Design a protein with these regions (language model features):
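Intrinsically disordered, low-complexity activation-like regions
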Residues: 8-72, 77-88, 93-129
């Protein structure tokens, strides 16, 4: 099913990988909604990623912190996707502190030197709120 240019399907929280998240978030179709989302896109993100976000909030993907791309993927899940899934709800900020920890860990490990500009933007995003 397609809607507003984004493919609509759920992610399996048991088999999701950092490339799955990064391929989705950094696709040309998704980029157009980074800072100009719609209620429909927010709902699609919620349907697709809410169970993944819940697992991340429980620490399920903490091993992703060991790589640059894994760190960015985890930050997208913890920091960006909740803002869409829970717009105008304090729950959207529930995992922000976890995202800050991931970002600081990534910087301390020099991962910021491995990332392109777009990924670097989202690595630093939790530190800008």
């Amino acid at each position: 099913m397609r809607s507003e240019g984004i493919y609509f399907f759920t992610m399996n929280e048991n088999s999701i990988t950092p490339p799955d998240v990064l391929d989705y978030w950094f696709s040309e179709k998704s980029k157009q909604f980074w800072f100009a989302s719609t209620p429909q896109v927010d709902n699609e993100i919620k349907v697709r990623f809410e169970s993944v976000w819940e697992k991340a909030a429980e620490g399920e993907y903490s091993q992703w912190r060991k790589t640059a791309d894994g760190s960015v993927a985890l930050i997208v899940i913890l920091d960006q996707l909740p803002l869409n899934m829970f717009r105008s709800d304090p729950k959207g900020f529930q995992t922000e502190s976890m995202a800050v920890e991931v970002a600081l860990n990534a910087i301390n490990n020099g991962f910021d030197e491995e990332l392109n500009d777009e990924k670097l933007l989202f690595l630093f995003m939790p530190l800008m709120h």
